[in-house]
């Protein structure tokens, strides 16, 4: 691996190089000018850079990065400096590239529900711009009024509403970025779906180590018709935690569940006069959102749970002003603790929700042992703790003792099966602990990926990874044995041994997508169907782990017994699809409409790389921002980067009943107009499918008591139509996800699209006899193609679209355009340098 190099340019030569790009007022070198950039929000770390540059255009950023690469000059990209992990701390031998002046919203498309923004745009400004269209940007970190989208992307920021809506990575559809060597890449696009590895999701949370995002395409969501918010005061923290457990056990999925302890409440009152109940040891905030007809009865159930949980005071927000008052203290919690202590460290760990009580008791014990006050604020719904460790840095040894206490809390999170960070990232603060959460092999593989994109580690050097010493290359390819019968490993170790033993392998799961597992005459088939079984299922945590060869149908059956399901609606379950094959192909179904696709529910993976090493990524908790997002990298990777062996997913409570409205519109234009109206509506829809020219299926899910009223409201918008219920309704969607509508012998192709592209695509397809179905309100086309594939290739190339062949003849699985090939090839070199797995 290439060694790190430090620039030899030095400060005297900086003006001549950077001065050709920047005028003096945007090229800062004086000590007083550099002072504001010496730290971010974690002020215990400070460093003075050689210079700060303030670009105003993408071209200036690109030119600066290319200069840094040429001169081996380390650089750090910075937004508003709100990082709480030291993630934007300068490098003393490098420069800071300040991105606040790249602050334009380049496009806001209410029909497609996207915004294209520059990295310096403030988080809250996106929602403000989208508000006239009844849309908003869901991730809501506490610093959303000042933090930038570029920083949110770098650290995969979250917020109070992550349990329902997910984190930044779940809301970024596309990225234009400059890599550390100055190469420009475009990842993803405008569709909710994609072909190939989820490089967009993988880029998010890379903490600036993969270069600088220049443009970010964000997914906007309709503002809920109603919010119902309450706060409940408790005499003990344990009682508040028990209330959370009861809420989850009841199958209620709030938009947010937050808890603040006595010290945090004291700080909030001192700073913002939130008016919270007096004498509370803990305050619980719960918020439901959605259609009024659905939320109101669920909120009544929530109130009964809270009333029975021992709360001594309950307040229900009566209007938006009340709601804002409830959230005011919580949003200002971090900044408020300055009223209690001159200095503080904010921790950011995650534990399984069922172990919150154990974690809080341990924090209390450590606080007493160290005689250091700790205020607790946390996202109780996803187990994300934010202990605020209060100290006075002027006291000798106080900082060191506070850091020691913080470290013990981090290690506790690991010990309890959680993560060392849920949303703040590793940065400088937690570098030493990453190697305690992941083993040496995991770390080496992440570093190989990093160096495949940045050989000299120039981009945000010293962040995320501790010093690792030499990272060896993967082992060499062995002599080629004769190709034998199909291998069928039953254990992970057998998979590792198989990879080490053969120079060329192709993975196969249940055989439901045969075009993706064709092997050349020189490749060994690795059949994973016997690597099967659910390893761990915790209904109370909304998580399970299964081996890659486990049948989707088996998982669905196990989940249904607990009233839970896979919201991304994996396809081909009735034809033997496996969990590993579903992830490798990246195939979500019609039901992804409401809560998202595979990328929104895959939490962790283990895979075998080209050297036969077992590599882990992600975690077994619903919130995690530690290390590179290897789970997203493996989605759609088609076995090109490694052999998946086990996977951890998030699940949700399953709607108790469904109803589908089936309509026939007179033409395509009318059907698309209806789709557009649905996309901008506040309906919580499980699925929206279109079969051209005008047949629509719109699925609702929820409680039996409210479905009838919701169906009436839907009919008021779309027209009467036919209502399908019970077995007839279930069979309709089972046939859709198993592609029973596809004629025998047809090639099955997945094509990511957008609503705006459908008319152009239909101009071509309507001239050809082919069955097809648009899913997810026009974001995904499933095409049963009976003509020559060369003709489809030409159509896709003309329209700038890409397709994935799942079944049918063809030289390869890809059709039309592909993005991210350069990036994928570099990453493949890091994970499979000997080329054991198929090329991408």
Language-model-detected regions and their locations in the chain:
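Conserved glycine-rich FAD pyrophosphate-binding loop
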Residues: 2-9, 22-24, 31, 39-51, ...
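Generic secondary-structure signature for well-ordered alpha-helical cores
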Residues: 16-24, 70-73, 128-135, 158, ...
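Glycine-/small-residue-rich beta-strand-loop submotif within the FAD-binding core of flavoenzymes
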Residues: 44, 88-124, 128, 136, ...
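Short, well-ordered beta-strand elements within core beta-sheets of diverse protein domains
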Residues: 51-56, 219, 228-235, 287-288, ...
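Short, acidic (Asp/Glu-rich) active-site segment that either coordinates a divalent metal cofactor
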Residues: 85, 96-99, 209-215, 288-305, ...
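FAD-binding subdomain of flavoenzyme oxidoreductases
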Residues: 104-111, 115-258, 459, 471-479, ...
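A conserved active-site cap/scaffold subdomain adjacent to cofactor or substrate pockets
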Residues: 279-303, 674-723
């Amino acid at each position: 691996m290439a060694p790190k190099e430090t620039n030899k340019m030095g400060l005297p030569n900086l003006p001549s190089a950077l001065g050709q790009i920047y005028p003096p007022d945007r090229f800062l070198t004086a000590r007083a000018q550099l002072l504001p950039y010496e730290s971010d929000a974690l002020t215990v770390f400070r460093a003075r850079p050689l210079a700060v540059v303030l670009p105003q255009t993408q071209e200036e950023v690109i030119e600066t990065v290319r200069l840094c690469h040429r001169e081996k000059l380390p650089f750090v990209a910075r937004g508003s400096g709100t990082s709480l992990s030291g993630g934007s701390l300068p490098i003393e031998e490098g420069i800071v590239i300040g991105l606040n002046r790249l602050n334009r919203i380049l496009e806001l498309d209410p029909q497609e529900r996207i915004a294209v923004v520059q990295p310096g745009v403030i988080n809250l400004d996106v929602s403000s711009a989208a508000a006239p269209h009844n849309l908003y940007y869901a991730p809501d970190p506490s610093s959303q009024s000042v933090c930038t989208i570029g920083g949110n992307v770098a650290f995969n920021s979250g917020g109070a509403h992550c349990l329902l809506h997910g984190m930044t990575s779940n809301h970024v559809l596309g990225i234009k970025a400059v890599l550390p060597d100055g190469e420009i890449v475009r990842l993803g696009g405008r569709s909710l779906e994609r072909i190939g590895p989820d490089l967009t999701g993988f880029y998010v949370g890379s903490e600036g180590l993969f270069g600088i995002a220049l443009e970010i395409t964000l997914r906007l969501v309709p503002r809920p018709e109603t919010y119902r918010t309450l706060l409940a005061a408790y005499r003990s923290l344990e009682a508040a935690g028990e209330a959370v457990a009861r809420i989850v056990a009841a199958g209620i999925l709030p938009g947010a569940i937050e808890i603040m302890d006595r010290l945090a409440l004291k700080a909030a009152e001192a700073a913002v006069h939130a008016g919270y109940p007096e004498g509370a040891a803990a305050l619980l905030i719960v918020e439901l959102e959605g259609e009024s007809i659905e939320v109101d009865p669920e909120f009544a159930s929530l109130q009964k749970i809270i009333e029975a949980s021992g709360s001594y005071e309950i307040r229900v927000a009566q209007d938006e002003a009340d709601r804002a008052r409830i959230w005011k203290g919580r949003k200002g919690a971090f900044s408020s603790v300055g009223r209690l202590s001159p200095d503080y460290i904010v921790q950011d760990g995650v534990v399984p929700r069922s172990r919150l009580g154990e974690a809080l008791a341990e924090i209390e014990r450590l606080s007493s042992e160290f005689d250091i006050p700790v205020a607790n604020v946390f996202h109780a719904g996803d187990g994300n703790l934010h202990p605020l460790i209060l100290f006075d840095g002027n006291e000798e040894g106080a900082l060191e003792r506070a850091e020691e206490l913080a470290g013990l809390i981090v290690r506790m999170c690991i010990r309890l099966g959680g993560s060392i960070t849920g949303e703040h990232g590793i940065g400088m603060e937690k570098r030493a602990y990453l190697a305690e959460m992941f083993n040496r092999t995991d770390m080496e593989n992440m570093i190989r990926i990093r160096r495949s994109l940045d050989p000299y580690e120039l981009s945000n050097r010293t962040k995320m990874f501790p010093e690792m010493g030499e990272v060896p290359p993967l082992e060499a390819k062995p002599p080629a044995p004769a190709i034998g019968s199909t291998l069928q490993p039953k254990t992970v170790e057998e998979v590792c041994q198989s990879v080490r033993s053969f120079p060329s392998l192709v993975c196969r799961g249940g055989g439901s997508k045969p075009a993706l597992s064709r092997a050349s005459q020189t490749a060994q088939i690795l059949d994973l169907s016997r690597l099967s079984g659910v390893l761990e299922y915790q209904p109370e945590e909304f998580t399970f782990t299964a081996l890659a060869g486990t049948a989707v149908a088996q998982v669905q059956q196990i989940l249904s017994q607990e009233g839970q399901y896979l919201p991304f609606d994996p396809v081909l379950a009735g034809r033997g699809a496996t969990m590993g094959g579903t992830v490798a192909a990246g195939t979500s179904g019609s039901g992804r409409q409401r809560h998202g696709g595979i990328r929104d529910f895959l939490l962790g993976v283990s895979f075998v790389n080209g050297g036969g090493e077992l590599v882990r990524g992600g975690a077994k908790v619903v919130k995690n921002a530690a290390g590179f997002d290897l789970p997203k990298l493996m989605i759609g990777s088609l076995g090109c980067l490694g052999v998946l062996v086990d996977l951890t997913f998030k699940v949700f409570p399953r709607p108790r009943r469904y109803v589908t409205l089936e309509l026939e519109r007179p033409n395509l234009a009318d059907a698309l107009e209806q789709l557009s109206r649905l996309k901008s509506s506040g309906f919580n829809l499980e699925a929206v499918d279109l079969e051209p020219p005008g047949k629509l299926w719109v699925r609702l899910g929820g409680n039996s008591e409210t479905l009838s009223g919701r169906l009436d409201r839907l009919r008021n918008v779309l027209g009467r139509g036919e209502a399908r219920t019970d077995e007839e309704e279930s069979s309709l969607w089972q046939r859709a996800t198993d592609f029973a509508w596809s004629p025998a012998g047809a090639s099955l192709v997945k094509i990511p699209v957008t609503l705006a592209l459908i008319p152009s695509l239909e101009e071509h397809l309507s001239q050809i006899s082919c069955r097809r179905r648009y899913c997810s309100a026009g974001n995904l086309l499933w095409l049963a193609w009976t003509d020559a594939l060369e003709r489809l290739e030409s159509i896709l190339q003309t329209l700038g679209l890409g397709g994935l062949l799942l079944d049918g003849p063809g030289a390869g699985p890809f059709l039309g355009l592909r993005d991210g090939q350069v990036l994928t090839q570099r990453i493949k070199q890091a994970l499979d340098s000997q080329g054991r797995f198929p090329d991408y």
